Design a protein with these regions (language model features):
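A conserved acidic beta->alpha catalytic loop
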Residues: 28, 39-48
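Active-site nucleotide-sugar/metal-binding loop of Leloir-type enzymes
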Residues: 70-82
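N-proximal low-complexity "stem/linker" segments adjacent to membrane-targeting elements
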Residues: 1-28
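A short, glycine-/small-residue-rich helix N-cap motif at loop->alpha-helix starts
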Residues: 61-68
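Acidic helix N-cap motif at the loop->helix transition within catalytic regions
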Residues: 23, 44-53
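Residues at the starts of beta-strands that form the adenosine-phosphate
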Residues: 8, 33-34
């Protein structure tokens, strides 16, 4: 746990058009020291909602699950050693 009372874990949430789910998902991981929404070019309000909730946002076009996740792990500068990947729904 860090000085803010949050757990030293980075949460990565891959999304695409998850406006119905992203708010509740972000509320559920509010305990984490870092929350990143990894968006696949959503055309709905996913990014707006994530931004309002204080999540960091990284966007990248989706190619396939494996490459997308591996790209995130290799290219995003996470604040914590532990990374939890959570579906928005």
């Amino acid at each position: 746990m860090n000085t803010s009372g949050k757990i030293s874990v980075s949460v990565l949430i891959p999304t695409r058009n998850e406006e119905r789910n992203i708010g509740a998902c972000l509320d559920a991981v509010a305990w984490a020291g870092e929350v990143i929404v990894f968006d696949s070019l959503s055309t709905d309000a996913t990014i707006d909602i994530a931004g309002e909730k204080g999540a960091a946002i990284v966007s990248r076009e989706f190619d396939n699950f494996s490459d997308h996740k591996n790209w995130a792990l290799a290219n995003i500068e996470f604040q914590h050693d532990w990374i939890l990947i959570v579906d928005a729904d």
